Structures are given as structure tokens and as C-alpha cells.
């Protein structure tokens, strides 16, 4: 009986780890606003975002609402150019 219980606990733990590993990038990645520096020209002036910018946006996608609420970054993240940049990169504009 104890052996069966141990197997169930191990199975549940493994399942939890698989779910965490499969979670969207924002759930795993640390929020690092500095990763968005490559998007500055797109966010500030509406320039076409680079592939690197789009990749970094994808990696930081789970952090957008946190950035939008931050007094340092919020005005940029909520700007029309930022929304256009997200759309150009094929990302949904978050509703925070």
C-alpha cells in the first residue's frame, strides 16, 4: 500500500514538472525589461520590429502587464507603437 502511494506522489510530481515545462514562456522566464531594448525603435517611432525584437517580446510576453503597470516602462508599453509592434510580431495585445 505504501509503495503504491509513493508511486502516485512521484507520478503527480512528474506531471506537475511537465506542466511547468510546457507553460508559456512568460510563466518560466524572468521578467527582464532590458530584453526589450532591441525593440526601442519600433516602440518609440513605429519602425518595423526586427526578428530579435519579436523573439524577445515572445520570451517576455507573460511580463507585459507587469511592465504596463511599472511607472518606468508603462508609458512605452501602453503606447500605440507598442501595440503595433506586438501585432507586427504576431502577438496578442494584452488587456491588463
Swiss-Prot record:
Cell compartments where the protein resides: Secreted, Cell wall
Family statement drawn from the similarity comment of this UniProt entry: Belongs to the plant LTP family. B11E subfamily.
Chief place where the protein resides: secreted
Pfam families linked to this entry: Tryp_alpha_amyl (PF00234)
Protein name in the entry: Non-specific lipid-transfer protein 2G
Leader sequence segment: 1-29
Disulphide-bridged cysteine pairs: 31-63, 39-53, 54-89, 65-96
Gene3D superfamilies, per database record: Plant lipid-transfer and hydrophobic proteins (1.10.110.10)
Entry function: Transfer lipids across membranes. May play a role in plant defense or in the biosynthesis of cuticle layers.
Recorded GO CC terms: extracellular region
GO terms (BP aspect): cell wall organization; lipid transport
This protein's UniProt keywords: Cell wall, Cell wall biogenesis/degradation, Disulfide bond, Lipid transport, Lipid-binding, Secreted, Signal, Transport
GO molecular function, one term: lipid binding
Amino acid at each position: 500500500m505504501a509503495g503504491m502511494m509513493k508511486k502516485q506522489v512521484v507520478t503527480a510530481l512528474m506531471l506537475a514538472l511537465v506542466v511547468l515545462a510546457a507553460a508559456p514562456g512568460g510563466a518560466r522566464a524572468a521578467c527582464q525589461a532590458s530584453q526589450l531594448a532591441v525593440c526601442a525603435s519600433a516602440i518609440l517611432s513605429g519602425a518595423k520590429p526586427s526578428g530579435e525584437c519579436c523573439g524577445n517580446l515572445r520570451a517576455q510576453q507573460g511580463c507585459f502587464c507587469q511592465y504596463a503597470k511599472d511607472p518606468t516602462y508603462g508609458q512605452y508599453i501602453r503606447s500605440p507603437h507598442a501595440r503595433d509592434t506586438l501585432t507586427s510580431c504576431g502577438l496578442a495585445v494584452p488587456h491588463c
